[in-house]
């Protein structure tokens, strides 16, 4: 990976270890969990621009040339879905707090802000550097996931150690539910008598 600062953002040139046939300029490619647009493609190498907003929400602000990253091309609708839907719109970063062996797996403990963990539930999903993982346990400022040998070998998680930073994206469903419930709460005072949800009420609230 090569890096060049550009107008408060960053231009990254990434070499993939897989064939990019079928990828075109303008396509989205997930880099360490961030959805980025390919602006140049040459063989197995592609170039992306990272905006200041993405830099502020990601580990890219501390990226170094030669760093290994996770890559995934965008899902084609109608294709097979393994794991959960990951948008590539990062919520922020976390830190590896510890790693413990557990049979054939490793338990990763991550520290993360409450603004992120509040949307997690036990046995729910979270994307760590773009990797879809199941939340084993979650507290106010930390959470844990189990990583099998294949995942550790095929991704950057196999190289992580305590203190390393990771990109995080929570399951978007929780955020939608929270916003919907907040809107319902604000609308309560304006609700027609006896719960009459009529055409006027729906139109007033954007339906």
What are these regions (language model features)?
Residues 1-207:
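Conserved loop->alpha-helix
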